[in-house]
Amino acid sequence: MAGAASPCANGCGPGAPSDAEVLHLCRSLEVGTVMTLFYSKKSQRPERKTFQVKLETRQITWSRGADKIEGAIDIREIKEIRPGKTSRDFDRYQEDPAFRPDQSHCFVILYGMEFRLKTLSLQATSEDEVNMWIKGLTWLMEDTLQAPTPLQIERWLRKQFYSVDRNREDRISAKDLKNMLSQVNYRVPNMRFLRERLTDLEQRSGDITYGQFAQLYRSLMYSAQKTMDLPFLEASTLRAGERPELCRVSLPEFQQFLLDYQGELWAVDRLQVQEFMLSFLRDPLREIEEPYFFLDEFVTFLFSKENSVWNSQLDAVCPDTMNNPLSHYWISSSHNTYLTGDQFSSESSLEAYARCLRMGCRCIELDCWDGPDGMPVIYHGHTLTTKIKFSDVLHTIKEHAFVASEYPVILSIEDHCSIAQQRNMAQYFKKVLGDTLLTKPVEISADGLPSPNQLKRKILIKHKKLAEGSAYEEVPTSMMYSENDISNSIKNGILYLEDPVNHEWYPHYFVLTSSKIYYSEETSSDQGNEDEEEPKEVSSSTELHSNEKWFHGKLGAGRDGRHIAERLLTEYCIETGAPDGSFLVRESETFVGDYTLSFWRNGKVQHCRIHSRQDAGTPKFFLTDNLVFDSLYDLITHYQQVPLRCNEFEMRLSEPVPQTNAHESKEWYHASLTRAQAEHMLMRVPRDGAFLVRKRNEPNSYAISFRAEGKIKHCRVQQEGQTVMLGNSEFDSLVDLISYYEKHPLYRKMKLRYPINEEALEKIGTAEPDYGALYEGRNPGFYVEANPMPTFKCAVKALFDYKAQREDELTFIKSAIIQNVEKQEGGWWRGDYGGKKQLWFPSNYVEEMVNPVALEPEREHLDENSPLGDLLRGVLDVPACQIAIRPEGKNNRLFVFSISMASVAHWSLDVAADSQEELQDWVKKIREVAQTADARLTEGKIMERRKKIALELSELVVYCRPVPFDEEKIGTERACYRDMSSFPETKAEKYVNKAKGKKFLQYNRLQLSRIYPKGQRLDSSNYDPLPMWICGSQLVALNFQTPDKPMQMNQALFMTGRHCGYVLQPSTMRDEAFDPFDKSSLRGLEPCAISIEVLGARHLPKNGRGIVCPFVEIEVAGAEYDSTKQKTEFVVDNGLNPVWPAKPFHFQISNPEFAFLRFVVYEEDMFSDQNFLAQATFPVKGLKTGYRAVPLKNNYSEDLELASLLIKIDIFPAKENGDLSPFSGTSLRERGSDASGQLFHGRAREGSFESRYQQPFEDFRISQEHLADHFDSRERRAPRRTRVNGDNRL
């Protein structure tokens, strides 16, 4: 979520430092200083450490001593540097007299790649030292980001190498190299693969130096991608073979490439091209009159940010476009700005305001409630979210409001305060914000809103306003009362439900409304205290070694143990290339109570006895009498850091050799169990996360059988030498694999939780197997001769939006729950949704929900509009509930009450609280609601409709005056430009559609509208903003803390103008004839066609343990009639430098002024699910053509280091000679759409789906082929300098 904010909060001096000063600063930071680090964890006290800047890698590092680096941050990730004690890390020690540093001696570094930034809070020894660090780091931040790509690669290579070569010996082992390449997403099949390539580099044995590593990297990158169809590559490769350094791209050749292929008009000037090449290479030895690229450097340029598909000229703010009324702009807007996570238990933070403002957000929300001492607090009312002071928020806004943008900021006030506290709010607005607060109109006689230029550096208040002449009065609110809004709940919080399998209690979020109790799926109980550190249980020191991978126990009797140890070490070190010092520890066969250390040195196994003795009843361990340890674990840890010394050698213990058969004693392992037997066992445990591991018949092969989403699934595990493989993830052992997936999801959200064996089945297994977990409704007969089982009726969840094409179909949105589903053949099912019963919908748009366990009587009738939204697990009707406190508690929980229902016999739900007070309050409120449900609902509606407003606060409202939306006023004299309306997304959807979209756009041409997420989005997810934008809504408020597609689209919309927060809507939208949903209403706008080939990628991020198998989805998002997506094939096991086969993708865009081109890189996992890796989204109007790099971002829209796609992109006008060609993109796509529609609508209610619809499918395929041929022919005819929006200057 990169913005354009200055890194230093309060400025960084009068000007840029001179070259001499920069040199002095860099030398000083490289030497480092001793400073005190204040931690974010309460359990850690401040410590003095040495802080240094590593210029070779552009990192800040810290350590206690000179040897071991304890931590590091990349300078490229630093977002802001603040002088003073401006973080909560200092606040934790205010009461400790030992840690009260001088304000002028402190500074804070904020860094990270997510919305919520991390802090490095430091105390220096003097104010001069603080200034040195701030000034030096500020220069380094800018210089690091602006460095040319080859220099960034050099720094990245050194960072990777030094992460292994921590002692800076300039050498690493082949095993280290193999592991390093795996970490950067490159599959090394075996050690021989590396040896062959290292031989090419004249490295025949021993360790690898940095120079050899760097050369290997360049060789791997070029050899993998030289097959791409690129200019110069084919002919040059024939001449140079595998040696790219034997062939060059000269200055004239590069100039011609820029002109002919890239359409770069600036390249007509050879001097500019020369300067560009020199600045890219930045090599003193290459500063010659005619610079050149080696072939691998040319390919590197194609993937570089310097060759971006985005036209960087659009990054600059154009003041001439800032003179329209505010209502003509899209304005970057945040919802519940103060939150850092979900809507019910996350932290409210001042940093969230600072982050949003520095990202260019221009409309932020303040949710104000009565607080102590007469001053409001800000939080999400009636939830567990933490509270922050209103006055602190104002100071934060003042400090950060105009750092990223000088254009106006709108404060959207959600006011729940009393009159007295409203008056205090008004006073503080004026006191803190001063002259920046707008208190009077810019022009008294204006007939429209002022422009961004007229409101520069002004802050506007959005709040309800009194009628003229009132001191205070009750005014109607524009919000309809809804008991499904969590802010209107009577009580909510964390309670606990017992797991029926392991009888542990897990937290769930409960909400009590005026008529129902809602509760969520399992959640975290401490989201609001993310800085708290859970104390770890420490085993007895004498047993610490038992779980270490290097401890092998008793390997055999007599000399067998010695021989087994030698075999294990020899096989492991030869196969993996493990270094000297690789070791294992085993019980001694000769001396009871002693152990043997076996290690690898110079190609042989050596053994050393570890002695033990009792000292005052406590065991002690030692190799030599003069150095004794309290435990075997301490001894081994010591010699991993300090060398073993003897007359012949000195050597540290390096790599532990893992146990090979440790899994055989585990409760989840079954040596002789068939697939059918495993399934039968799991059918008796109807809980997700139940699992077992079984040996398969194939050599070195295992299977994990588990339950997820109500179904039994299997995945194969393969032993390959010393490595255990699950998909493309590598583990040292089967035990390590299971341990990893007990902490991380194995399949979607499912973690391995309940190990299953016969003993476990006796305790928790059901008497009757759950056959529904194994057999789908489409194949109900699990015995061939049995009568068919009745069709299952289940619930499904929508994966995508779907709009009905016929009267007998359902319309639903993504995540909708469709009930009472009947699975039919032919790809179409029936179900109930939105009040419609048993209508058709496509089965591939949904996924089946987990079979509901018989805990919740209303689970099959879940309320789709509940306050918990997608987090909902169950709902209870309060008037039907009976509450009973269990004085004795239950299963180690003291504070338990039961909920039962008279209508459901023999059913109750046991719920636990954290305290007696909490239990009593819940029981009291539930009983009250049960008695007064109807009256409370009526009272709530009445109270919410009337609100008192203080005059002092009302007077601060000038332009943003919220009023109830009145459709009848649109286009009449009663419409006032100062009035605006707010809509939850559900209400907005009633206007942003074909029926009313044009009318709503007319409203937005004069007045502001604000749209915000519905209250049920407790997970802080976002809605699709595109329909709101195209209908003219200016303030489309999103949860900035959530890294989802809507926020990525938001970042793309506002990327022009340096994220200034204001984007002028296209002039088309101000045309009275324009209809957002009718492409025939477009006037004066030329449609375009885009052809894209995805050629390759570099430096894709990892997702978990394995090497990724990436594919790319290309999407055009914009007007409803333009939106479409296509995808490439996936590449197996390569995220470092994958290449895709040549395949053009074609897109037709009718409204390019409101269109985005979006690339998303996914990986396909072993379950054929797609997992997000990276994305890049651009407005179509700013795209360049030719062979272009697509710099990739993470899900928070932060730049990924060196990650990019290489594409070939051409953009054509869709019309030729003024008329549409019979084989133009438009006509072919419409013909294809017709054929697709026939295929889609003509589904079989009976009979064969395949036979009846073969012909429409064939017509669709032929149309698509014609479209591809059309693009190819146009590409051959079109000049190479095709461009969009003028000059494609870099």
UniProtKB/Swiss-Prot annotation:
Domain SH2: 550-657, 668-756
PTM info: Tyrosine phosphorylated in response to signaling via activated FLT3, KIT and PDGFRA. Tyrosine phosphorylated by activated FGFR1, FGFR2, FGFR3 and FGFR4. Tyrosine phosphorylated by activated FLT1 and KDR. Tyrosine phosphorylated by activated PDGFRB. The receptor-mediated activation of PLCG1 involves its phosphorylation by tyrosine kinases, in response to ligation of a variety of growth factor receptors and immune system receptors. For instance, SYK phosphorylates and activates PLCG1 in response to ligation of the B-cell receptor. May be dephosphorylated by PTPRJ.
Annotated S-S bridges: none
Enzyme class at the top of the EC tree: hydrolase
Residue ranges of every copy of the C2 domain listed in the record: 1071-1194
Domain PH positions: 27-142, 489-523, 895-931
Record-annotated SH3 domain positions: 791-851
Annotated active site: 335, 380
Gene Ontology molecular function: any one: neurotrophin TRKA receptor binding
Chief localisation class: other
Assembly notes: Interacts with AGAP2 via its SH3 domain. Interacts (via SH2 domain) with RET. Interacts with FLT1 (tyrosine-phosphorylated). Interacts (via SH2 domain) with FGFR1, FGFR2, FGFR3 and FGFR4 (phosphorylated). Interacts with LAT (phosphorylated) upon TCR activation. Interacts (via SH3 domain) with the Pro-rich domain of TNK1. Associates with BLNK, VAV1, GRB2 and NCK1 in a B-cell antigen receptor-dependent fashion. Interacts with CBLB in activated T-cells; which inhibits phosphorylation. Interacts with SHB. Interacts (via SH3 domain) with the Arg/Gly-rich-flanked Pro-rich domains of KHDRBS1/SAM68.
Domain notes: The SH3 domain mediates interaction with CLNK. The SH3 domain also mediates interaction with RALGPS1.
UniProt-recorded name of the protein: 1-phosphatidylinositol 4,5-bisphosphate phosphodiesterase gamma-1
Organism of origin: Homo sapiens (Human)
